[in-house]
């Protein structure tokens, strides 16, 4: 590669790196995205769920009033430009796992902040195909992303803009100085690491408390139409209906084993979970995928500059909520880099200095 000058090198073209690069390009900054074609990205195996209310306590995502509109604007804008569909809004049928979850739901129904996002079941018939002894509810303003298709389209946009290089990145090949960074003859003012779980091995950011979580999902087809077929079903595991009639089902959660090889053990676990919740339905597996979620111990992203090398930056740690969080944070971080706007203090890595 001949010597060239950019404003930013972005390492990783998962959802975080892609949307940050897009925001910087929109601010007339020259970027070069370096990626190994998703070898380490959890984005291509994620469910791509957009879900404002999560967890056993049915907790509303902090900042949802600005995070969700930012995500919707981002994905609709990409769809309009591409002429393709990436974002599929769908309600979610939430199946309670126990009496405690039912009690949390009843409390949330008394809180006006939850009114736009949760509703009682309009009819018990929605549960006719699901084993649900504790009942359930409807979660609104949910949906999912076709992440693989969206990232492929974005990669093509970076390529035609001379802003993409497919290669394996090695930290030892990066030179950092007071004037910026250099990699393979390419000089830039700054490097931004969007490496997903590999961020935990980054020599500049390995001190940050990542909480990596490995997960596997199944692709497949049920042997009959499940009711409701036009909802995401969250019954401990999520069952996500694809537009072509296929489903995604997942996910497992492991903290000890951190590789991306699929396992027979996970397949058996997921199939047992499927049959427990959908006892009268068969499921033919057509594919299986594994990935590692780059979550954090305090559940906030890692964004900002290295405390000793300000040209070295990170944009990572979005865990399983990347589809909802990344659009707003990408725009904010780009504004911080270009216009010196302040970072969200909860996400700024200076909290660990």
Regions found by a protein language model. Give the residues of each.
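N-terminal Rossmann-like FAD-binding beta1-loop-alpha1 element of flavoenzymes
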Residues: 6-32
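Active-site substrate-recognition segment that forms the wall
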Residues: 19-27, 36, 44, 49, ...
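Dinucleotide-binding Rossmann-like beta1-alpha1 core, especially the glycine-rich loop
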Residues: 49-129, 133
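Short beta-strand to alpha-helix junction loop
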Residues: 58-70, 137-153, 261-266, 324
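Helical element adjacent to the flavin cofactor pocket in flavoenzyme catalytic cores
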Residues: 137-190, 194, 198
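C-terminal catalytic lobe of FAD-dependent flavoproteins
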Residues: 284-353
């Amino acid at each position: 590669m001949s010597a060239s000058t950019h404003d930013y090198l972005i390492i990783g073209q998962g959802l975080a790196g892609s949307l940050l690069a897009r925001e910087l390009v929109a601010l007339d900054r020259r970027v070069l995205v370096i990626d190994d074609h998703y070898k380490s990205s959890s984005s291509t195996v994620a469910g791509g769920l957009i879900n404002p209310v999560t967890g056993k306590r049915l907790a509303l995502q902090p900042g949802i009033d600005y995070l969700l509109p930012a995500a919707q604007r981002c994905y609709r804008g990409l769809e309009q430009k591409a002429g393709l569909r990436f974002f599929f809004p769908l309600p979610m049928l939430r199946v309670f796992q126990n009496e405690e979850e039912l009690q949390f739901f009843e409390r949330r129904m008394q809180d006006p902040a939850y009114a736009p996002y949760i509703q009682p079941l309009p009819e018990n018939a929605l549960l006719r195909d699901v084993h649900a002894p504790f009942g359930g509810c409807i979660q609104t303003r949910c949906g999912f992303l076709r992440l693989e298709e969206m990232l492929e389209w974005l990669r093509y946009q970076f390529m035609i803009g001379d802003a993409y290089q497919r290669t394996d990145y090695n930290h030892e090949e990066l030179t950092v100085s007071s004037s910026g960074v250099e990699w393979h003859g390419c000089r830039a003012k700054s490097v931004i690491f969007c490496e997903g779980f590999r961020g935990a091995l980054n020599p500049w950011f390995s001190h940050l408390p990542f909480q990596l979580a490995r997960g596997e999902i199944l692709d497949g087809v049920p042997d009959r139409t499940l009711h409701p077929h036009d909802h995401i079903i969250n019954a401990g595991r999520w069952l996500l209906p694809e537009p072509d009639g296929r489903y995604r089902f997942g996910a497992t959660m492991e903290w000890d084993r951190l590789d991306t090889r699929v396992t027979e053990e996970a397949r058996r676990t997921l199939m047992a979970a499927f049959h427990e919740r959908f006892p009268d339905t068969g499921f033919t597996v057509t594919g299986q995928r594994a990935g590692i979620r780059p979550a954090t111990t305090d559940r906030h992203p890692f964004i900002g500059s290295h405390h000793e090398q300000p040209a070295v930056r990170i944009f990572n740690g979005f865990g399983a909520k990347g589809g909802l969080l990344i659009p707003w944070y990408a725009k904010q971080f780009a504004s911080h880099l270009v216009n010196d706007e302040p970072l969200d203090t909860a996400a700024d890595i200076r909290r660990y200095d």
